[in-house]
Amino acid sequence: MILIVGLGNPGKQYEKTRHNIGFDVIDYMANKYNIDVNREKFKGICGEGFIENKKVILLKPLTYMNLSGESIREFVNFYKLEDDEIIVVYDDISLDIGRLRIREKGSAGGHNGIKSIIQNLGGDKFPRVKVGVGQPKDNLVNHVLGKFSKEDREHIEKVIPVVSDAIVEIVKNDAKESMNKFNGVNIE
């Protein structure tokens, strides 16, 4: 079983914000793979299904970004998942809009959601897909909690299917394969 986690914040006011790109990807994958993400469990909303003949759980933690690891830890403990059976997708301000970066492991890089996951899992050896949301011009909080401009939103809507494909490549093969195919790709 593979746990695919999209990071974000619950609530209408956070929908379609930069910080919620992980939720947007989960919604896209749920629709594409016909998985109902509507069950509340372990401080999150989730759905189970199959992608590439592998059982998956799509998860959106409802703990708010900075406590995301609490929800993930409960899933990991209940389903007895290994680190490489967790895939996390989230926003990255160090990447331009339209850029992806897949990693097998690594530090939080200043991202509080990832910091929470590392603390709760006791390690950083889980694959992750970073989605570029651009650098803030001034205030970081206003930037990540802000919505995309119309032009940037249109760009992100083209990026989300590619992010989904990168995640599926990890499910099908592994993070290295996905890195080889998708790192450095710029979606116009």
Curated annotation (Swiss-Prot):
InterPro entries: Pept_tRNA_hydro, Pept_tRNA_hydro_CS, Pept_tRNA_hydro_sf. It catalyses: an N-acyl-L-alpha-aminoacyl-tRNA + H2O = an N-acyl-L-amino acid + a tRNA + H(+). It holds the Pfam family Pept_tRNA_hydro. One of its GO terms (biological process) is rescue of stalled ribosome. The record marks 9 as: Discriminates between blocked and unblocked aminoacyl-tRNA. Its EC number is 3.1.1.29. The active site is at residue 19. TRNA binds at residues 14, 64, 66, 112. Keywords: Cytoplasm, Hydrolase, RNA-binding, tRNA-binding. The record marks 91 as: Stabilizes the basic form of H active site to accept a proton. HAMAP family: Pept_tRNA_hydro_bact. Belongs to the PTH family. Hydrolyzes ribosome-free peptidyl-tRNAs (with 1 or more amino acids incorporated), which drop off the ribosome during protein synthesis, or as a result of ribosome stalling. Monomer. This is Peptidyl-tRNA hydrolase. It comes from Clostridium perfringens (strain SM101 / Type A).
